[in-house]
Amino acid sequence: IKNAQYRYIDHLASFIPSKTKTILDVGCGIGGNTSFLLKKGYSLEALSPDSYQKSVIKEKFNRDVTFHHCKFENFKPETLFDLIFESESVCYIDIDKGFKKAREALKEGGYLLASDYFVFFKDHSNSLHFKSSHDMDTYLNSAKENGFNLIKQYDQTENTMLTLDYANYFIERFI
């Protein structure tokens, strides 16, 4: 799974525009993506409302990364960013408030790179995926209404399903 995570962030990083220097990692977790992007030479700030993640980030990066302990919707940017990076954190952000905050935190001509799982269909399912994801059409419409233009859309499903299926098999068999 660790190798799959590395391939995933490496793939996401390929979408970062070449002129990007400053990145805000929204929903940074314990800093895997932050660490990867720092090694690529970007200037990073990280954000999470989680206290445990705050302690890990502070210990892991010391003063190399400014950490913002808040929800993205409540973030008060002191600087503007070339790119806002949301990897597997989109589903925790209120759609309209998130786009408004992204607009506020980005430099003119800045980018929002959002990667998460979205609901593409309405099957009235009770699955956790259905309950914890944003509807893709609603998300894209809000992006447009908030002045964002879709540059690239990529469906990662085929590349991730084998890993997810294996993890599910492992859990069901051994746990």
Tell me what each language-model feature is.
Residues 74-84:
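A short acidic, Gly/Pro-enriched loop at the edge of an enzyme's catalytic core
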Residues 24, 28-73:
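Class I SAM-dependent methyltransferase SAM/SAH-binding core
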Residues 152-175:
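Conserved catalytic loop of SAM-dependent methyltransferase domains
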Residues 113-138:
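Conserved class I S-adenosyl-L-methionine
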